[in-house]
């Protein structure tokens, strides 16, 4: 394949602005699917979790052929918790498509990826999507994008970007948003015209490994873009590791991406993206070089983790009832496997234990996606409260600070500002957009844990919240966490409506009647600050004296159900979240009430 006929582009967009839909339509335009083949929606988000949350977690590669040119499309995760993924992926591209919603405009997370892309020097094409929505404002959004690029110090060449308007859902793109066209070829033509072809570099081969794939048959597969020279099947090569060591090995098979899949190929020349099968020991950031005189490429810098959690085996009374993998050996193997492909993750044993791990990552979302994935695979485990990773810089204790943007209706703005400042947030700017207010803060990562639930409650679910890591700054002082105590089950058994009904004035419950509970499990939130041990397993004594139906029937408020992130943000340091494939419970670490009292006294 001639180099002039390849384009490598990355797609940058905020969660839910239609990135994956756009790629679907590009695949259709490249006639990947036979006319009669049934295609699913969201072909790229092929991981169950991604479809449910509507977010892309892992980057995917697909390619289409258009006018004799191969376009490699690289889908990037939009969320800054997956920043480790984003940076490596951008290294494979020569240009990028910035996709923005015609109503919302560029969002904070988009800014994070765009900044990385402009720093590498990628040439952008801006696509204003969803112009079929009522009350959209494409012109204003275009201005906002331009201002954003200026803020991010884009070069003049980058600022001279083409704009495409359209609606990916309705399958059209054009240069004017008022006149729909019949297909998205206008966008593909812009890609061919404005995105530079990769440079053809002659010489000894070099390829930086930027992501991993795994196959049950062939093991780990290295994916990357050939930087220089050509790679051939069966060729002898040297792998230069990040730590400077070198290892001689051989390429078994080469694959390039075509459509949604891969095809086996004899050789790959510089500029194209390929997958190499048959290498044993390699990590992301290693370089594949010439056998005789290896010259490594500069490695990729990956953001350091900012948050850690304690993972431990499930030792609750309901241990092993629902999961397939419950032992420490299973969990350890699974975490080690995750380390191979999840770059921003770190795992270490807690000192003095072999069944407790400290797992560090980029944020609550990053770690909760891992827990959720493990849960679906049949693992049982318990997780402690998320802790922020402190650093000592020049003898000063420092903590990670994030940029937080909250968009709320005007009447809730003062409540929101009050909540954030109480958690040591500093307001940076505030602008009114119609009847909504956009407020920006700098806030410690500790302050964000548990903030989302509160802000959503205070704004009746209307707040839009986004945050991204900024830098380490000196420690900001104590932050008060959840102010209410919890209600703890007194003994194990089945919860009865009769008991719950009599306790409803003490707080709100997290369990329904007929749920199985165990002693020490958290069954609700107390109104006051102290914890309260309650007996929810007490049933009504029926005797001949009283007819069973004469009493008031129990009227029970529906239970509050937590998502995994909410539960992680809710618990205190003396509590765990127990995660099994079928259920999620919160519990005290010390289940026995007398022992817990004794521990609290010390």
List where the protein language model places each region.
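Conserved nucleotide-binding/hydrolysis micro-motifs of P-loop NTPases
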Residues: 17, 29, 33, 79-80, ...
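Catalytic P-loop NTP-binding/switch module of NTPases
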Residues: 227-353, 376, 558
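Long insertion/accessory domains within large nucleic-acid-processing enzymes
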Residues: 257, 262-265, 398, 443, ...
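Conserved C-terminal guanine-recognition region of P-loop GTPase G domains, centered on the G4
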Residues: 96-158
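P-loop NTPase switch module centered on the Walker A-proximal segment
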Residues: 1-106, 144, 212-215
């Amino acid at each position: 394949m001639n180099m002039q006929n390849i384009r490598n582009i990355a797609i940058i967009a905020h969660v839910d602005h239609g990135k994956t839909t756009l790629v679907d339509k590009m695949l259709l335009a490249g006639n990947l699917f036979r006319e009669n083949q049934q295609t699913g929606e969201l072909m790229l988000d092929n991981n169950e979790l991604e479809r449910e949350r509507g977010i892309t977690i892992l980057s995917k590669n697909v390619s289409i052929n258009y006018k004799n040119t191969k376009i490699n499309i690289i889908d990037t995760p939009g969320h800054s918790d997956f920043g480790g993924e984003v940076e490596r992926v951008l290294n494979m591209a020569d240009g990028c498509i910035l996709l923005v919603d015609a109503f919302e405009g560029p969002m904070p997370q988009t800014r994070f990826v765009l900044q990385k892309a402009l720093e590498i020097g990628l040439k952008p094409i801006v696509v204003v999507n969803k112009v079929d929505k009522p009350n959209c404002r494409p012109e204003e959004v275009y201005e906002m994008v331009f201002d954003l690029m200026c803020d991010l110090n884009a070069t003049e060449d980058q600022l001279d970007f083409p704009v495409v308007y359209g609606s990916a859902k309705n399958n059209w793109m054009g240069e004017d948003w008022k006149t729909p066209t019949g297909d998205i070829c206008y966008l593909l033509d812009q890609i061919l015209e404005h995105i530079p072809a990769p440079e053809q570099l002659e010489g000894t081969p070099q390829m930086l490994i930027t992501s991993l794939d795994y196959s049950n048959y062939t093991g780990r597969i290295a994916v990357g873009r050939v930087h220089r020279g050509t790679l051939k099947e069966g060729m002898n090569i040297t792998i230069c590791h990040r730590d400077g060591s070198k290892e001689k090995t051989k390429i078994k098979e080469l694959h390039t991406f075509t459509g949604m899949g891969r095809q086996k190929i004899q050789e790959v020349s510089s500029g194209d993206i390929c997958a190499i099968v048959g290498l044993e020991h390699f990590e992301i950031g290693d370089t594949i070089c010439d056998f005789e005189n290896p010259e490594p490429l500069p490695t990729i810098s990956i953001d350091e983790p900012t948050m850690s959690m304690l993972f431990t085996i499930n030792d609750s009374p309901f241990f092993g009832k629902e999961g397939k993998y419950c032992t420490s050996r299973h969990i350890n193997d699974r975490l080690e496997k995750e380390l191979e492909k999840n770059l921003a993750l770190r795992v270490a044993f807690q000192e003095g234990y072999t069944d407790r791990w400290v797992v560090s990552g980029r944020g609550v979302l990053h770690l909760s996606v891992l827990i959720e994935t493990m849960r679906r695979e049949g693992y049982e485990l318990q997780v402690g409260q998320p802790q922020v990773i402190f650093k000592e810089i020049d003898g000063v204790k420092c903590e990670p600070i994030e940029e937080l943007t909250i968009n709320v209706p005007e009447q809730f703005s003062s409540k929101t500002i009050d909540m954030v400042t109480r958690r040591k947030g500093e307001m940076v700017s505030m602008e009114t957009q119609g009847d909504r207010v956009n407020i920006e803060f700098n806030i410690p990562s500790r302050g964000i844990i548990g903030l989302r639930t509160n802000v959503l409650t205070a704004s009746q679910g209307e707040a839009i919240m986004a945050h991204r890591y900024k830098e380490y700054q000196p420690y900001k002082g104590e932050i008060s966490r959840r102010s209410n105590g919890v209600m703890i089950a007194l003994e194990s058994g089945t919860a009865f409506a009769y008991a719950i009904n009599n306790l409803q004035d003490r707080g709100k419950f997290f369990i329904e009647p007929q749920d199985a509970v165990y002693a020490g499990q958290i069954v609700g939130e107390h109104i006051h600050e102290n914890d309260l041990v309650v007996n929810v397993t007490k049933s009504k004594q029926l005797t001949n004296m009283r007819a069973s139906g004469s009493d008031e029937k129990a009227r029970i408020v529906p239970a509050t159900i937590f998502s995994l992130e909410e539960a992680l943000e809710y618990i205190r340091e003396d509590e765990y979240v127990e995660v099994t494939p079928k259920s999620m419970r919160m519990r005290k670490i010390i289940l026995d009430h007398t022992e817990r009292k004794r521990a609290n006294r010390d």
